[in-house]
A protein has these predicted regions:
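Predominantly the C-terminal beta-signal and adjacent terminal strand-loop region
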Residues: 165-228
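Residues that define the transmembrane beta-barrel architecture of outer-membrane proteins
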Residues: 27, 51-55, 102-106, 129, ...
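Outer-membrane beta-barrel translocator domains and adjoining extracellular loop/strand segments
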Residues: 43-48, 84-90, 121-124, 145-150, ...
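Gram-negative (and chloroplast) outer-membrane scaffold detector with strong preference
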Residues: 67-145, 210, 217
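Short glycine/proline- and aromatic-enriched beta-strand/turn motifs that initiate or cap beta-hairpins
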Residues: 23-62, 208-220
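Residues on the lipid-exposed face of transmembrane beta-strands in outer-membrane beta-barrel proteins
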Residues: 33-37, 59-63, 108-112, 135-139, ...
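Outer-membrane beta-barrel strand-turn architecture
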Residues: 25, 63-67, 114-116, 162-166, ...
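Bacterial Sec-dependent N-terminal signal peptides
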Residues: 1-27
Length: 228
């Protein structure tokens, strides 16, 4: 009888240790940064997004609502450039232009993970990696050839996350960003074909392809039955 009780206690102790070792701490926030490359589509480049690649750096902050849903604030700094000599389309009077610019962007985006993202806790069917889709709104400020402009942007795209460790995340994200302005490439290239631009018509686009590293913090309420 005593041996049976001792065996049960030993099994319970081992099970408790196993659960403690495999349990996943749940965190609310994720912060980090990344580097990558940029592309541009507009009056100085109408076809190949990567014909004049630039560079970008970014900082990110996520609120992780659940293993599937997150809100992300991103701050980007990057360079863009273009040259009409590379284009097959000819501008009026065979004019040639080139530009380079530095932009600053602040965006707020929604993320949806295709899998329950996380580690441990098999009953929640958590996966160590997940692809995701994302979209939102932003504001971009830039300086091109002495001209400083600003415009709203609509960033959207896809990405993938991988948990290197319990709280450390590696990510790769591609975003296309529609700028509600035709002056991202400067005033000289605004409406070169005399087709007047509107708020959403005949405006410039740019992209970012960014490799990110981030760290989770701020544990959720361990005794609550809901996500705070």
């Amino acid at each position: 009888m005593k041996k049976g009780i001792m065996s049960l206690l030993l099994c319970a102790l081992c099970l408790g240790c196993f659960q403690k070792a495999t349990a996943q701490e749940d965190y609310r926030f994720d912060a980090g940064g990344g580097i990558g490359m940029t592309g541009y589509l507009g009056d100085a480049n109408t076809a190949n997004l990567w014909s004049h690649p630039g560079v970008d750096g970014m900082l990110l902050f996520r609120y992780m609502r659940s293993p599937r849903i997150a809100w992300k604030t991103g701050f980007y700094v990057g360079t863009l450039s273009g040259n009409t000599e590379d284009m097959t389309d000819v501008l009026p009077d065979a004019a040639q232009f080139k530009f380079s610019t530095t932009f600053f962007e602040l965006s707020e985006m929604f993320e949806f993970n295709f899998f329950n993202y996380g580690m441990g806790e098999r009953y929640r069917k958590l996966k160590r990696w997940s692809p995701y889709i994302t979209g939102g709104l932003g504001v971009s400020v830039w300086t091109t050839d002495g001209y400083t402009g600003a415009a709203f942007t609509v960033p959207f795209g896809i990405g993938a996350k991988y948990k290197i460790k319990e709280r450390l995340n590696l990510g790769l994200e591609f975003l296309m960003k529609k700028a509600f302005s035709d002056r991202l490439d400067g005033r000289l290239l605004s409406d070169p074909h005399a087709i007047k631009s509107g708020f959403a018509k005949n405006t410039d686009w740019y992209s970012t392809l960014t490799l990110t590293l981030s760290y989770e913090f701020s544990k959720r309420c361990a005794t609550c039955n809901y996500k705070d």
